[in-house]
């Protein structure tokens, strides 16, 4: 297969900057562009949630993609498609919309997350069917449909059943990337029976009268990947972090492939970033201090020249470290640091963090929603970036931090270790690592980091060394391209 002829449709539940809840959105912001540079022709599909601003992102209607009929077992709904280009690229991004299913702001949720299960299940089925119906109306036939996590987990099963006799879909291959094994898309079987024919239902992964979308997906995609060798090992070996996924992985002849994340140097470049107060590079590191001063002033705090600023950008969901951060706040506040936290998700956790900020007004600031601009500004301003996730497939946060001269502090949690080099003792590297998931271990690691920070010359060597590291997608994109060729039979 010639690289230039590989056409790939990427399907995701979230993409930054349109909407961001997890690192998946960061992955999708850059990965399709990296694959285009590798020679693929990429297009993207995602839901048009109510929170996505049409004017801000220049979404526009496509007349020939209006009133697309999406037929489930008992009814027919109409699908409308809006389109824009993925920022910093010309990649066409299609937003699938139906007022009944996507007018509300929320992303997909399931029984694990205490969602409105009936409506959420209907949204999922509508979206999966809608992806295939939109492709037919569009008349653009991809060689590969590459889906992210469980949101489009029905696509390969639908291709093998309801759409098996459709000539348009002949020879299309499917790839799944698992970013988070905890999120599995679990719904009552009876809901699917109302919407899909028995030929689909009979091939779903069903346990205790519930359908597991992620397990179903792993059973039917042509290839399954995740975002690091370490996380692939964790999932395949049946550790607790696999959440049972090993039971379906072991049945696959081709197993699970780990390919690390990369960085888009055009999107994440402090020397050209329009979202930060002062652009900088290794020759202009003093401008990083100006960024720090600006961010602190935004939160009503004063710059303390000799005090490092710690940043943290977290989503308050399970295993992402929000509770560890909360438990560590008092201990962190005893150290000579200032801390700025951007947190989204759980309102109760946000309230608790805000109460802590009131108790430490000169040392702690909390921003209670996700903002792309604040995200970039924290990277540009902070000296250290706390990434408290307990389980991480690979993540992108440590890559952003390294590129912006903010030294990560991470737990030895899966794939993030593959993209950093530990600073230990007199040995320089790119990140500080705590090896026990506890407040005590985190605080001890911060004490080591502050000791290193106090050595100005060494700190500058670490920061400048980080900023010139090659973190790009180049090697990983080549591996994905090889995977695509293998899935298509090496044509």
UniProtKB/Swiss-Prot annotation:
Annotated GO biological process: glycogen biosynthetic process
Pathway noted in the entry: Glycan biosynthesis; glycogen biosynthesis
EC number: 2.4.1.21
Binding-site list for ADP-alpha-D-glucose: 20
One Pfam family cited in the UniProt record for this chain: Glyco_transf_5
Keywords noted in UniProt: Glycogen biosynthesis, Glycosyltransferase, Transferase
SUPFAM superfamilies reported for this sequence: UDP-Glycosyltransferase/glycogen phosphorylase (SSF53756)
GO MF terms, alphabetically ordered: alpha-1,4-glucan glucosyltransferase (ADP-glucose donor) activity; alpha-1,4-glucan glucosyltransferase (UDP-glucose donor) activity
Domain of life according to the entry: Bacteria
Classification via InterPro entries: Glyco_trans_1, GS/SS, Starch_synth_cat_dom
Reaction(s) catalysed by this chain's protein: [(1->4)-alpha-D-glucosyl](n) + ADP-alpha-D-glucose = [(1->4)-alpha-D-glucosyl](n+1) + ADP + H(+)
Stored NCBIfam families: glgA (TIGR02095), PRK14098.1 (NF010698)
Its biological purpose: Synthesizes alpha-1,4-glucan chains using ADP-glucose.
Family: Belongs to the glycosyltransferase 1 family. Bacterial/plant glycogen synthase subfamily.
Protein name: Glycogen synthase
Species lineage: Bacteria, Pseudomonadati, Chlorobiota, Chlorobiia, Chlorobiales
Encoding gene, per UniProt annotation: glgA
